[in-house]
Regions:
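Short, surface-exposed "cap/lid" segments of acyl-processing enzymes
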Residues: 1-35, 40-42
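Alpha/beta-hydrolase active-site loop
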Residues: 46-73
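Active-site signature of alpha/beta-hydrolase-fold catalytic machinery across serine-
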Residues: 92-96
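A conserved short beta-strand
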Residues: 99-113
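The feature captures the conserved acid-bearing segment of alpha/beta-hydrolase catalytic domains
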Residues: 109, 114-178
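C-terminal catalytic histidine-bearing segment of alpha/beta-hydrolase fold enzymes
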Residues: 164-200
Length: 200
């Protein structure tokens, strides 16, 4: 989405699709990969707002919710994994009261864009919804949030603060990996993708 901290990409399609590679590692029966808006497929409705200030807007999030509703008619259980910005989508879907969602895993994830903006001192995503009120709505879903000890894009302070706000909740866990934002996750995922996530 961004070439660097100050330059917006004209095409949000990742040059190194880590989330897709993580999905390929998973040996589950039915793995479905959802890209972000305007990745891989371009349309006349695509504009830079969709991968910058509006990336967590109501229209974007409701589109994913529609997909989730459709998938819920096909499968008895849904386990959501979100990488980087996709983690915010995963967290939002956890607030939709969909009974099919059994766990949430995030990897190097922007789990609260409002908090991240404060931590790294960037302009907030003004056209995106506020994530703070949503956190409690997903707190009964087993979650584990993986962060990289060398991640300079999404500092582990984000996960640490989230955990402190929810430290009394046994459903929410965080775990450190030896990784940066885009390096080290594939090897980590090979040994961790199938770890059970529960509220014990």
């Amino acid at each position: 989405s961004w070439i660097d901290r100050f330059t917006i990409s004209s095409n949000p399609t990742p040059t190194d699709p880590i989330a897709f590679k993580l999905a390929l590692i998973d040996k589950g029966d039915n793995i479905i990969y959802l890209a972000r808006p305007c990745q891989y497929i371009w349309s006349d409705t695509c504009n830079q707002d969709l991968w910058t200030t509006s990336q967590y807007s109501k229209v974007v999030l409701e589109t994913y919710e529609e997909v989730l509703t459709e998938l819920s008619t096909r499968y008895t259980e849904i386990h959501i994994v979100g990488y980087s910005g996709g983690a915010g989508i995963a967290m939002y879907l956890g607030t939709t009261n969909n009974p099919k969602i059994k766990s949430i895993r995030t990897v190097a994830g922007n789990i609260n864009h409002n908090e991240l903006s404060k931590i790294i001192k960037i302009s907030p995503l003004r056209k995106s919804i506020n994530f703070y009120p949503l956190e409690k709505k997903a707190n009964k879903i087993p979650q584990i949030h993986y962060y990289g000890n060398k991640d300079k894009v999404i500092p582990n302070e984000l996960q640490q603060r989230f955990y402190l706000r929810n430290k009394e909740n046994s459903c929410i866990k965080i775990k450190q990996a030896k990784a940066s934002h885009n390096k080290g996750w594939l090897n980590f995922w090979i040994n961790n993708y199938n770890i059970k996530v529960d509220c014990s």
